[in-house]
Amino acid sequence: KNFCDEKGLDYEIELVNDMQDYFTKLQMYINSDTLPDIFGCPNGTLSKACKDIDALVNVGDELERNGYDEKLNGAIRDFLTDADDGNMYLFPQGLYCEYFMYRKDIFEKAGIKDAPTTWEEFEEDCQKIADQGEIPVIVGGSDAWQLMRYLSFSPWRVTGPEFIEGYQAGTDSFSDNESAKYAVNLLSDLGTKGYFEPGFASVDFTSACNLFFGGSGAIFYTGSGQISLAEEMYDNGELGFFPVPDTEGMDNMSTNVPVHAGFAEGFNKATYDDTMQEFFDYMCENF
């Protein structure tokens, strides 16, 4: 807004509140090659679709041009680097990490002294919590990415990016990869044994946040993007944290806290003129 006011420019912002509706609309824009000047885009299938139609500005080159490449966090650069050509096509929204939060009072009530370090311990703790009449885990099941996290935990800890890259390339599958098969069984257990909240499949992430931070459920997978919601409970000593557990019986990498760039921004190559480049520099200076 400030940039446009200074330059005497008009601007239009399109808001789509529902995540799945947003993805659908973004795909429509990609299919018709009518992407807006700037658009939110997760790193993955949708960004690849944009790249396939040559619709993305090379953000890495632009950061090198204006001197901000050396100021970019290395983990964020790695996260947004394209696996095919090594370029960076998305501008990071921020630096985020993800982890499990848990309510200490419910753990104590269930006789759980330490946070789980393996998925086997995680499920055992869920049963102890359920035995106390409490909801073990809150999840926003209507937002697919929430459940996908549970499918990704085990292969990520065991193979790093190897499985997901192989899955996308068609060279690996959930039926062939042992860590991925483990993840399928884990998610099945959590859903069928009643460890998720009732009706979890119709609960979106925002509602899941409201449930957990409103006092329902023992465990919630979230991250630094929602840390402000946890402030009161944390200040009162009610919350604990633990990273993604190990997959027992397999060789796990030491990294257990996912780090990412959030919902990154793409710049439409077709409309990236001198004014847009000037705005890009303004973003870098003021973001």
Which residue ranges define each predicted feature?
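Conserved N-terminal structural module of periplasmic/extracytoplasmic solute-binding proteins
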Residues: K1-I53, D61-E70, D114, D235, ...
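Short, solvent-exposed loop/beta-turn-alpha elements that line the ligand-binding surface or hinge
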Residues: G60-A75, V158-Y182, E232-M233, D246-N256
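A local structural motif
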Residues: E6-N17, A110-D114, D189-S202, M233-E238
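Extracytoplasmic/periplasmic substrate-recognition and gating elements
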Residues: E6-K7, S32, G86, K109-A110, ...
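Extracytoplasmic/periplasmic solute-binding protein
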Residues: T81-Q93, E98, E123-D172, S188, ...
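Glycine-centered hinge/linker elements that transmit conformational signals in sensory
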Residues: C126-K128, A169-F200
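Hinge/lid segment of periplasmic solute-binding proteins
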Residues: G44-Y99, E123, Y150, S179, ...
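Short helix-initiation/N-cap motifs at beta->coil->alpha
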Residues: V16-K25, G44, T117-E123, G199-F213
